[in-house]
Amino acid sequence: MCTPCCVSQLACCCGSAACSLCCGCCPKIKQSTSTRFMYALFFMLVTVTCVIMMSPTVEMAMREHIPFYSQMCQQLNAGENCSTLVGYSAVYKVCFGMACFFFFFAVFTIRVQNSTGCRAAVHNGFWFFKFVALLACCAGGFFLPNQDQFLEVWRYVGAAGGFLFIIIQLMLLVQFAHRWNQNWSSGATYNKLWYAALALVTLVLFSVAVGGMVFMFMYYTHPEACFLNKIFLGVNGGLCFIVSLLAISPCIQTFQPTSGLLQPAVITLYVMYLTFSALASKPIEMVEDEIKGNITVCVFPFKSGLKSDTNIVTGVGTAILFCCILYSCLISTTKRSSAALQVYRNDMPENERARCCFCWVDDTEDYDDEKTSGGQNVKYDERDGTVYSYCFFHFVFFLGSLYVMMTVTNWFHYDNAKIERLLEGSWSVFWIKMASSWVCLFFYMWTLVVPMLFPQRFQA
């Protein structure tokens, strides 16, 4: 069994064969899924490297536990204690290499319509050579001339790409909310229990959102300070209430019969999350107390002195952040989700079946399996045509690379950025997250009113 598996992996690394696991008892995997998983693996590998580069804790641990650390840095000409391989400038250079890698493949795979051509073969295989190319791109960033000028220009390129990635992410969320309601509403036509599921989930989502708002009023407002927090909490809460009423208004339901409260519940919960994230990223405020002196107000409890919790919260927050990035990069390129980048159409497929995990349903039909000797079976689902846009897939990962770069280096507060201080306050991060909440609400309101404004374009 070992020899056939090695041959299969060699064909994957050095040829156009799809990658698969060596264990034959593993579930079948589609070629399109295998390819996207491998690119996601590349992406996460570089992302973890960037996190390590921004962590003084990891740098100190390596210095203490690797006996030849100083000698290795000297051999690599990386400066004293590898100073050129850590910090925000190193992250900029590594992410520049990853962005160049995905941008090249985005251009290389333009208008690829089937998997039989040589460009599709390169996209779906030759993983060893692509891994070497990725390493070369990331290393090449350290040899660019005019480093200071490069970092200055690349910072603004990264900010523009990061903003565009945020917009795509928000459009995906709006499309996800519509698809969820559409899928479960279709189930109610043959099983009324789906109505109960809709009502229960809607109630839970609104309850969590309201609870989150109460929590923020408790911890992020103060009678004598934090007036900006009060304004934004009131504005976002009011906007969420307005879009919820708008979603069930007769004028909207005339053009979108499936519009209900589930979509605004999803949007409201996400807006409350963005609001919380923005307020948590805001610089701390202090007021003068007659008894205690200057005290910190409008912060989460762990920021008031319980520093032992900071690393835990930062670690969990970072993990959630990168999971969301990875989900956005992978899901945005499927045929179903690519509709999110267009104006939403309220058309119900005739064969729509309600599913609890509807978002993971493949766009492809059943295909014949191709046996992989000694390993996992692969379904070559792209023989008749591609099931996702190769070019757009790489473009989203290109934008994701820029978003990771800006997030890990704390956007425009990069000089003293550390991964352990990812959740500490800065005005740039605050305004980015607060603006994201408004953009999300705008996108959802637009999908509600545009069929009413342009009815001729949305007729079945």
UniProtKB/Swiss-Prot annotation:
An individual GO BP term: phospholipid biosynthetic process
Location(s) in or outside the cell: Cell membrane
Keyword field contains Lipid biosynthesis: yes
Keywords carried by this UniProt record: Antiviral defense, Cell membrane, Glycoprotein, Immunity, Innate immunity, Lipid biosynthesis, Lipid metabolism, Membrane, Phospholipid biosynthesis, Phospholipid metabolism, Transmembrane, Transmembrane helix
GO molecular function annotation: phospholipid scramblase activity
Primary localisation category: membrane
Pfam families linked: Serinc
Residues the record marks as carrying a glycan: N114, N183
Signal sequence bounds: none
Topology class, membrane: Multi-pass membrane protein
Catalytic activity: a 1,2-diacyl-sn-glycero-3-phospho-L-serine(in) = a 1,2-diacyl-sn-glycero-3-phospho-L-serine(out); a 1,2-diacyl-sn-glycero-3-phosphocholine(in) = a 1,2-diacyl-sn-glycero-3-phosphocholine(out); a 1,2-diacyl-sn-glycero-3-phosphoethanolamine(in) = a 1,2-diacyl-sn-glycero-3-phosphoethanolamine(out)
Cytoplasmic side of membrane: 58-89, 146-156, 219-230, 281-311, 413-433
Transmembrane parts of this sequence: 37-57, 90-110, 125-145, 157-177, 198-218, 231-251, 260-280, 312-332, 392-412, 434-454
SS bond partners: none
Gene Ontology cellular-component terms listed: membrane; plasma membrane
Residue intervals annotated with topology Extracellular: 1-36, 111-124, 178-197, 252-259, 333-391, 455-460
UniProt record similarity statement: Belongs to the TDE1 family.
Function: Restriction factor required to restrict infectivity of gammaretroviruses: acts by inhibiting an early step of viral infection. Impairs the penetration of the viral particle into the cytoplasm. Non-ATP-dependent, non-specific lipid transporter for phosphatidylserine, phosphatidylcholine, and phosphatidylethanolamine. Functions as a scramblase that flips lipids in both directions across the membrane. Phospholipid scrambling results in gammaretroviral surface exposure of phosphatidylserine and loss of membrane asymmetry, which leads to loss of infectivity.
PANTHER family, per database record: SERINE INCORPORATOR, SERINE INCORPORATOR 5
Protein name: Serine incorporator 5
Organism whose genome encodes this protein: Danio rerio (Zebrafish)
